Amino acid sequence: MARLMSSALIRGLVRSSCSPTVAAVAQPTIHQFRNYSSGLGGDSTATGDSSSTRVAADPDTHQDFQPTTKSSNMSFDDIVSQDIKENPVLIYMKGYPDAPRCGFSALAVRVLKQYDVPISARDILGDLKLKESVKAHTNWPTFPQIFIKGEFVGGSDIILDMHQKGQLKDVLGDIAQKREQNESS
């Protein structure tokens, strides 16, 4: 039985290493934020009560490789406000644009990518405090939540509806033009 399982495992590994490679295709710019999170409970450093974990007893650990903490005096509400203000197209979503973890988030990204605009995103699954701050900011219960030019637009259903009616092109038009101007400069 063990021999059978190991043979099957080896055959599977050999097959996967022989699979064809996929060519890279140019895609719109996507900014993926690092959450201020250390786990599901949220990040203690975002509220100012940070604690550092260091390996003091290990003389071989170089300072460059010792763990560090991100310290920030910003509240989650401040982070949400700053994200919205600084990013022309922002999605608070489950996962990231390159690896969405929900069908609705994937749909929103797919629609927005058609307009060749820079998309900024933040994964809300990594931090419940961030997720709750976004919900409180918009008074909207579901994700993804999409902001365009500092305005809350809605979720994937609203973006899809705007796309189908031609409204999204008008809203995103000047963002795409600014990107083209920056690339040609």
Swiss-Prot record:
Region (Disordered): 37-74
GO molecular function: 2 iron, 2 sulfur cluster binding; metal ion binding
Binding site for glutathione: K94, K131, F143, S156, D157
Main location as per UniProt: mitochondrion
Record's subcellular location: Mitochondrion
One Gene Ontology term, aspect cellular component: mitochondrial matrix
Transit peptide: 1-36
SUPFAM superfamilies: Thioredoxin-like
UniProt feature, compositional bias: Polar residues: 64-74
Pfam family, one: Glutaredoxin
UniProt feature, compositional bias: Low complexity: 43-53
Binding site for [2Fe-2S] cluster: C102
InterPro entries per the UniProt record, alphabetical: Glutaredoxin, GRX_PICOT-like, Monothiol_GRX-rel, Thioredoxin-like_sf
Family membership: Belongs to the glutaredoxin family. CGFS subfamily.
Chain's role: May only reduce GSH-thiol disulfides, but not protein disulfides.
Protein name in the entry: Monothiol glutaredoxin-S4, mitochondrial
